[in-house]
Amino acid sequence: MTTLKPALRRAAVLLPIAAVASSLFPIQEASAQRALVTADGSSTVFPISEAVAEEFQKRNKNINVTVGVSGTGGGFKRFCNGEIDIANASRPIKKEEVEACRKKGIRYIELPVAFDALTVVVNKSNPVNSITTAELAKIFGRDAEKKTTNWRQVKSSFPNLPLRVYAPGTDSGTYDYFNEAILNKKGTRGDLTASEDDNILVQGVSRDRGGIGFFGFSYYEENKGKLKALAVVNSNGKAVMPSVQNVLNGTYDPLARPVFIYVSEQAAKKANVRSFVNFYLQNAGKLSREVGFVPLPAKAYTAATQRFRSNKTGTVFAGKSLVGGSIEDLLKAEGIN
């Protein structure tokens, strides 16, 4: 497996231009006095958290919010070690992560913030328009390694074209979800190109005529001029395109999924973290839509806000993803009527 490491991306507010005229030391002192909120994890959730951080910092110039990208798994590792305040996650916390947090005394508040359509993409020149979950397994599955190397091996009507496979790395929540929903937890082939950075996957597929990959819908929306999204055949046998509408109506299964932030109970005691998380939940609906996600119903954000303010810790998912679930299924899992 070729694994490409992402550069760490961060959202931050620059010091006011007027301050640049002052000497270096006052600038450093002013910066040091700013309160800090730290988040890390999913590249899929990054656009939402980045958008929220930017808007929050416009209104709270005394608070600096950093948003890193290390994949959902990487974010949970840092979170359970007490290194960050918030973990961005494109899947629920796993049982082993629950245990890792427990061992370090890290209690957490689980907050769903939006729904995503995991999107399968190919090169713009590829004539394939739709694909089944079985065909996806035949392309990405462990058994395909060094065997399925041409599109025509997947289906006789597919083009005679070398197959090049791109996928998120194993620290990615998007990888975990795809592995569970499509590959029955058997893992991906070892001869693909993997990266936690979705932009690297975009570049790979857009430059490779036989390329195929998958990532969150927002990255497809941002790069749809370079890529082609495939319709995925759902449980009713209908080929359905990834879209906000098809997530809302529940037809884009099994690749529609909720995304989350997890807030450390200890961090939530800090006024700057409380202020940021409250702002996040108040604005996630509007901002998630702007960056290509499907907002949750208003009652879901109200319930999440109540959960946060009442300090209700733990997970309702028992270490499992909501595979093939709709927004209504998420609300039921969260106990929201």
Swiss-Prot record:
Keyword Disulfide bond on entry: no
InterPro entries per record: PBP_domain, Phos-bd, Phosphate_ABC_transporter
One example GO MF annotation: phosphate ion binding
Position of the signal peptide: 1-30
One Gene Ontology cellular component: plasma membrane
Protein modification: The N-terminus is blocked.
Subcellular location: Cell inner membrane
Keywords of the record: Cell inner membrane, Cell membrane, Membrane, Signal, Transport
Role, per record: May be involved in the system for phosphate transport across the cytoplasmic membrane.
Protein name: Protein SphX
Species of the source: Synechococcus elongatus (strain ATCC 33912 / PCC 7942 / FACHB-805) (Anacystis nidulans R2)
Lineage, broadest ranks: Bacteria, Bacillati, Cyanobacteriota, Cyanophyceae, Synechococcales
